[in-house]
A protein has these predicted regions:
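Short, low-complexity patches enriched in S/T/P/G
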Residues: 1-5
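Extended amphipathic alpha-helical interaction segments
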Residues: 114-199
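N-terminal Sec/ER secretory leader and immediately downstream segment
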Residues: 21-22, 26-128
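Generic structural signal for hydrophobic core residues of well-folded globular domains
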Residues: 61-64, 90, 105, 128, ...
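Hydrophobic membrane-insertion alpha-helices, especially the h-region
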Residues: 7-22
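Residues that cap or delimit alpha-helices
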Residues: 86-87, 91-117, 139-143, 185, ...
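A cross-kingdom marker for long, charged
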Residues: 191-238
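Residue-level detector of alpha-helical secondary structure
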Residues: 37, 47, 54, 58-65, ...
Length: 238
């Protein structure tokens, strides 16, 4: 899988993780660090499916809060761990759940770009210019749908329709990716490298956001089964 495709997968999946760290807006965060989490559907599913992981993350956040860490510092510490968990779930989720998961990622990205190109870039590439918390910027109804998609994906990955990735699926995904990448390389020219080197996107924030959305828009235009295969392959090689 092309490195650019892997990076494109990382940035759009990573942004979804922040929904699990929504405690930042709750007045009880200092006295009861996990109180706000109890109302978060995705957090409840994690607790049900992997209680040891749930406790480890919860304990880590309590310690960081006591140390006076900022909201963004806690997000930056916890996000990679939850991302890894979600990537594993995507491998076993049915096609429709995988595609919906990515579709809502793209809807979030488009909504963030309507706020500003800079916010969109920070949303996708927090390591480059510093992140932005979408819970503070985007419409609540969109975030609710984002979180519901997370829940449905995680539950489906452990349900009776649990998916098994085959070598044929991976081979088909690689074949589907090639013309998409060629098309984008021709369209964007040298700027196509922004997918691989996002730090070069400073000053080209709009173009960087457009490129990520163009990439995944092309993937989502594929038939559902094949789009899901590309998504699974991209995140599996992160």
């Amino acid at each position: 899988m092309n490195k650019r495709m892997r990076i494109g997968a990382v940035v759009v999946i990573a942004v979804a993780v922040i929904s699990v760290i929504y405690f930042s807006q709750q007045p009880s965060r200092d006295s009861q660090p996990d109180a706000a989490f109890n109302d978060m559907p995705a957090w409840q599913v994690i607790k049900e499916q992997d209680p040891a992981f749930h406790k480890r993350i919860q304990d880590q956040m309590v310690v960081m809060q006591k140390e006076g860490k900022t909201e963004q510092q806690i997000i930056d510490a916890v996000q990679p761990q939850i991302l890894k968990l979600q990537v594993g779930k995507l491998q076993h989720a049915p096609d429709k759940n995988v595609v919906e998961y990515m579709r809502l990622n793209m809807e979030q990205t488009a909504a963030m770009q309507k706020v500003s190109d800079d916010d969109c870039f920070r949303f996708l590439y927090p390591a480059v210019k510093g992140g932005v918390n979408p819970m503070r910027v985007l419409d609540k109804s969109l975030m609710d749908r984002r979180m519901q998609a997370d829940v449905e994906m995680m539950r489906a990955a452990a349900g009776p329709d649990r998916h098994t990735v085959t070598q044929q699926e991976r081979d088909t995904a690689r074949a589907d990716v090639a013309p998409i990448m060629q098309k984008l390389a021709k369209k964007y020219g040298d700027d196509f490298q922004l997918l691989q080197n996002p730090s070069k996107g400073v000053g080209k924030e709009k173009l960087s956001c457009d490129l990520v959305q163009d990439l995944w828009g092309n993937v989502l235009d594929l038939p559902e089964e094949r789009a899901a295969g590309v998504i699974r392959l991209a995140v599996s090689e992160m």
